[in-house]
Amino acid sequence: MVPVVALVGRPNVGKSTLFNRLTRTRDALVADFPGLTRDRKYGRAEIEGREFICIDTGGIDGTEDGVETRMAEQSLLAIEEADVVLFMVDARAGLMPADEAIAKHLRSREKPTFLVANKTDGLDPDQAVVDFYALGLGEIYPIAASHGRGVLSLLEHVLLPWMEDLAPQEEVDEDAEYWAQFEAEENGEEEEEDDFDPQSLPIKLAIVGRPNVGKSTLTNRILGEERVVVYDMPGTTRDSIYIPMERDGREYVLIDTAGVRKRGKITDAVEKFSVIKTLQAIEDANVVMLVIDAREGISDQDLSLLGFILNSGRSLVIVVNKWDGLSQEVKEQVKETLDFRLGFIDFARVHFISALHGSGVGNLFESVREAYDSSTRRVGTSMLTRIMTMAVEDHQPPLVRGRRVKLKYAHAGGYNPPIVVIHGNQVKDLPDSYKRYLMNYFRKSLDVMGSPIRIQFKEGENPYANKRNTLTPTQMRKRKRLMKHIKKSK
C-alpha cells in the first residue's frame, strides 16, 4: 500500500509550498494569505523510486469560526488518513499557542510525527528552532521550502528511512494506469492513436459553476463522504480537487473546482488564482458538468463559462441543482428560461437534481459515459465520406460565382471533441448555414450526444497549378507534323 504523508500546521506556515516541492507541481495555491488551503489536497510524490501520497491541509489556529472550523475538521481528517505527519511551524513567528494545541493533538493520536521548522532562510537555524523543543516532539528539521533548502535532507533523513522501516507490500495502485498514461503524455511517449483505447483510462470529470451553486455538495453526494469543504458561503472551494473514484465498474477522476465569478467581482488575488485553476481543470477534463442554481436562474456568467467549455471542445452535461422545494409553476418557468437561453446547446443532456437530498444524482453518470463515448468513438474514413455524400444528396451545396461547391471526401481529424475534416473545391466559400447543416447531419448520423462536433474544411489542390504544360515525346512528334502541315497549306 502506498504510504500517505500529511502536512499539518497553522495557516501560512508554508504547507502548500512544501507540497509543491514534494510533488514537483504548482497544484496547491501559494500566496501570503492565512487560510489559503481550505480542503485536503492530494498529490503523488517520489523519492529514490519509492512513491508516497502527500496531503496538503487547511491550517488550524484554534480561533476557528464559520468555514474555518470546517477547515480544521478537514485537517484532522487528514491526520487520521495519514501514515506519517509532517508538523510544520514558522521559525520566523516563533512558538505560538496554536502550535502547542496541534502538538498535543498529534501526541494523542500516536502517529509517527516529524517537526519541520520552515522559513529559516536568513536565520541561524539552531537559534531559530530552540523554542520548538518545548513541544516535546523530538528532533527539529529546519527548512526553507520557498527556496528548497533543507527539503532534500528532510526527504533523505526522515521520509526515506521511515518508508524503509515501513516496508510496504507490493500492491498494484488502483489508479496506476491513469498515472502511467499521465507520465507518458508528459514525456511525449503516448501510444499511437490506433492503439489508444479510451475505455482503458479513467474519465476525467470536472464539476464547474458559479460560487455556491452546490458543486462541492454534489461531489460529496457522489463520493458518499464529506471530502470537500461545504459551507453556505460563496467561495468555500478555492482550489481544484482531483479525486479518483469508481462507479459501476468504470473509473473516474472527479475534479471539484472553485466557483467562477464575474471578472469585475474578482478582487481577491487568491480568487483570481482559483479561476485560472477552474479553467485549467476544464481543459484537463474529458467531460464537464456545468452546475446551475435553479433558484437564481441562468446568469451571464453561466453563459460565459459555457462558452469557455464549448471553445475547449469538452463534452458537457448540464446540471440544474436545488430543484427540490420549487413549486410546479416555478419549475415550468425555469425550464422555459433554459430552453430560451440554452437553445443553442442542443447536444447536451440536462438533469434536474437536488445534490443536498440526492434526488436525480444517480442518473448523471449515464449521461457522462454517453458523452465520453461519443467524444472518443473512432469512425473510419469510408463511413464519414458516405455520410458526407448522403448529406450532399439530401441538400446540395449552394452555387458560388455560378459554380457548385464540390465536396470530395471526409476523414477523422481528431477526438475529444470529434473532428471531421472535409476536402473539396471552393469549400472556403461555403456559407455558415451550410456548415451548420453538415455539422448537424454528422451529429445525427453518428448519434453524437453530449459532445460538440467540429467540421474543418480543406481546399483540394490543383495538381497542375503553377506547372508548365510539358509535352510527351508522342505529343511532340504530333506537334511537329501539325506544324509542317500548316506551313505546306500556306
Curated annotation (Swiss-Prot):
It comes from the Bacteria. The keyword Nucleotidyltransferase does not apply. GTP 2 binds at residues 209-216, 256-260, 321-324. Coiled coil: none annotated. Keywords: GTP-binding, Nucleotide-binding, Repeat, Ribosome biogenesis. Residues 377-461 form the KH-like domain. GO terms for molecular function: GTP binding; ribosome binding. The keyword Ubl conjugation does not apply. GTPase that plays an essential role in the late steps of ribosome biogenesis. Belongs to the TRAFAC class TrmE-Era-EngA-EngB-Septin-like GTPase superfamily. EngA (Der) GTPase family. This is GTPase Der. It comes from Escherichia coli O6:H1 (strain CFT073 / ATCC 700928 / UPEC). The gene is der.
